Amino acid sequence: MLKRCLIVGCICLIAFSNITYAESDPSKWPLVKEAFFAQRPMADAPFITFVAPRRAESGAQVPLEISIDQTQADANAIKTLYILVDSNPIPLAATYHLTDKLGKFKLATRIRMEMDSYIRAVGETADGKLFLGSVEIRAAGGCGGTVDGDENAIRAAAGKIKLNVESPVKFGDATPATFIIKHPMRTGLQRDLVSQGFVPAFYIQKAAFTFNNEPVMNVDFGVGTSEDPYLRFNFIPSTPGVLAVKAFDNDGKEFNHQTEVRN
């Protein structure tokens, strides 16, 4: 998958290097689809839906909500969800690995967009079937540009986590949880304001959520996820316990946090 990201990223960088704003182009999707899901059939999925702005205020922080109107007991239960942005230099924004502790999956997050684009949510079942949901959003300038500040201080401050569970908790029912981790999520496409050299990619790669030491959700982040990654998702606690998260960045640093879940 990483190799495919790099191939598509190189192609897109060449294609978009002189473009800062353009209307969404549906013809880009076949290229992205072939790179990530070569020759695999994919069905439209009315059960994958979005809540998103028609035009985002900032391409660096585009709010996105995704819902899957099925449970993990359904015949075509989605086990893996890929979020792709057709027109981004690196299209894959994040991959979500789902479990039955999520019930009907509902997620709010924030992504980067370099230009107007279709956003794709591709769901994969345990037996490899693929299902597609799409939404069009207008936005610009979220992946490149210039950054400033003391890079050493920014890196030192990275990794602080907030993890909250909404109360009151009704055990056995969907319960909202919110995760935020402080991190610049450098894309590798941004330039230093002073030197004008490219700032190396520096981002959260993975986050693993557990409840009472049992998996809830694993996330593979890409640089298409916004600065200070934000997730709001529902999970189903059956008893009091501990919701925990373990995150890793591409420098190999590990960050941990947990919160009690109780009435």
Regions found by a protein language model. Give the residues of each.
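Bacterial N-terminal signal peptides
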Residues: 8-17
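N-terminal edge beta-strand
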Residues: 32-61, 152-174
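Aromatic sugar-binding surface patches on proteins
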Residues: 99-108, 223-232
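Extracellular Ig-like/FN3 beta-sandwich strand-entry sites
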Residues: 114-118, 174, 238-242
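Short beta-strand edge segments in extracellular beta-sheet folds
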Residues: 136-142, 260-263
